Amino acid sequence: MESQSLCLIKNDIFQLLIQLSKEDTEIDIDFTRIILDKLLNTNGIQLAMASTILRFKNPNIYQIIDQRVYRFIYGEIMKEPYSIVTKIDFYIGYLEKLRDICDEYNLDFSLSDRQLYALDKKYNPDFKIKY
């Protein structure tokens, strides 16, 4: 029998997600903190999944946090913090750094997680990722 994981997202989180517009281009840090806190306090949702949900809602503001992209932009292995508050700060800092790199190198922020992931695979093929 195959094991399945189930994640139950409460209605208040859906209501917050509805408030995210695909047309927005500026991050609302306070709102982001609220929604990340709710997502990360949901059983089965870690930072990578929370960032994926946010990216799905608006890729112009949010990108998926990924070990390869992190390594490519910071030059070191990603060490995800333990506490939820620290994870939120970590992700917001990641987005700010990613935005700066996109501005500096004229990259489309909405595609940057995919582009930098591919660059890391190309230029760091011998460095394996721990899952």
Outline where the language-model segments fall.
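Catalytic Zn2+-binding segment of zinc metalloproteases
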Residues: 56-62
